[in-house]
C-alpha cells in the first residue's frame, strides 16, 4: 500500500484552513450560497453503466433513509477526503473500458488496480461510506470537459459547499472552481434517481489530463 504524500496532505490542510477562514469572514448571500452548491434543473436518465453495476452490487445501490443533511466539514472530515482521493488516484492506474473489458462502457470496482474515471469514483464512494460517510452526501456526477468528452467525478455534499474528488486532480476543489460543465448526478434522496444540473458555464481548459 502506498503511503500518503506529506506534501499533498499539507496542501490539503492549507485549502481546508482557507475554506474555514473564508466562511468566517464572508456573510452568506443568496448568490454565494448558489455558488457553493450546483443548482438542480429536473430529472435525468441514469447512466447505463450505473444500472448494470447495480445489477451486480445491490447493496451499494439501495436507497437508505437519510436526514438530508450535508456533512459538517470538520478537520477530520477533510482529512478523510484528502486521504481517500490521494490513495485511489495513486494506486489505481488509468485504463479505458475498451482496453480493460473490451466494452464501450462498464462500471466496476477497480479490484485489479485498473479502471477509468467511473471506477475511481465508485471506489472513493465505497471507501468513504466504509469510513462512516452518509451515502446521500456522496454523489456520482457526470461532467463535460472542454474537449466535449464526458467524465465522472464524485461530488461530496458538505456544509461548506459541494466538493469534487477527481482522478484528474490531486486537489479537492469546490465544484465552481473546477474546469468542468456539470451535467447530471445522483439524487440525494435515492442513488438510482438522477437529476440534471443547471450549470450554464462552458468547460474551461484548466484540468490536468491523467
Regions found by a protein language model. Name each.
Residues 15-19, 47-49:
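Short hydrophobic "helix-edge" motifs at membrane interfaces and signal-peptide entry regions
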Amino acid at each position: 500500500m502506498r503511503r500518503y504524500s506529506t506534501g499533498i496532505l499539507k496542501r490539503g490542510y492549507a485549502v481546508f484552513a482557507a475554506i474555514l477562514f473564508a466562511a468566517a469572514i464572508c456573510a452568506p448571500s443568496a448568490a454565494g450560497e448558489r455558488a457553493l452548491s450546483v443548482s438542480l434543473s429536473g430529472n435525468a436518465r441514469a447512466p447505463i453503466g450505473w444500472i448494470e453495476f447495480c445489477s451486480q452490487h445491490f447493496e451499494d445501490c439501495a436507497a437508505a433513509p437519510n436526514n438530508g443533511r450535508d456533512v459538517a466539514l470538520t478537520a477530520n472530515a477533510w482529512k478523510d477526503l484528502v486521504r481517500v482521493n490521494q490513495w485511489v488516484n495513486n494506486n489505481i492506474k488509468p485504463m479505458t473500458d475498451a482496453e480493460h473489458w473490451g466494452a464501450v462502457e462498464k462500471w466496476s470496482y477497480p479490484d485489479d488496480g485498473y479502471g477509468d474515471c467511473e471506477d475511481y469514483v465508485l471506489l472513493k464512494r465505497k471507501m468513504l461510506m466504509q469510513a462512516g460517510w452518509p451515502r446521500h452526501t456522496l454523489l456520482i456526477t457526470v461532467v463535460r470537459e472542454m474537449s466535449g468528452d464526458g467524465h465522472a467525478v464524485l461530488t461530496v455534499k458538505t456544509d461548506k459547499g459541494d466538493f469534487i474528488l477527481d482522478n484528474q486532480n490531486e486537489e479537492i476543489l469546490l465544484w465552481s472552481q473546477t474546469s468542468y460543465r456539470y451535467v447530471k448526478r445522483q439524487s440525494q434522496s435515492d442513488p438510482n434517481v438522477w437529476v440534471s444540473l443547471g450549470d450554464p458555464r462552458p468547460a474551461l481548459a484548466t484540468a490536468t489530463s491523467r
